[in-house]
Amino acid sequence: EANKRAFDKFSVRELIHICRYGRGHVIGFHPEGKRSLSSDPYSFLPAQPGIGKVIYEAQPQVVPVFITGLRNELAKQILGNWTGGEKVRIWFGEPIELNEFYTKRDSVRTHKEISDFLMTKIGELGEKDRAEFEAHK
């Protein structure tokens, strides 16, 4: 457990460094801390403060993304490439403005607020997908 925590802290520091100084890098991150295993692509787990901490400290450009159509069974997902499996739909939002958070105190509360705000933006993209997908059923 102690080794895992030490590795997690190292990973967060490294991620902050890459976000701050690694121009041109694209990093995908689940604000929930992991992928939801729900079959409903529009239900999310609660946002965790970890990505908020990374964003607060590195102040990178943040683009929300909503992805649906990926399943939790890798073998079926790969097989779907040949058998016409479910289409993967990806929605990219506009870069989001986070300056209002950078003037707040560096705290877990602020990190959580950033993560929640990001999840709201991802949820908005999910609602666009739902409206578009339901209209074409």
Per-region residue spans from a language model:
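Catalytic core of membrane glycerolipid acyltransferases/transacylases, capturing the structured
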Residues: E1-D8
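Non-catalytic C-terminal accessory region of glycerolipid acyltransferases
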Residues: K9-K137
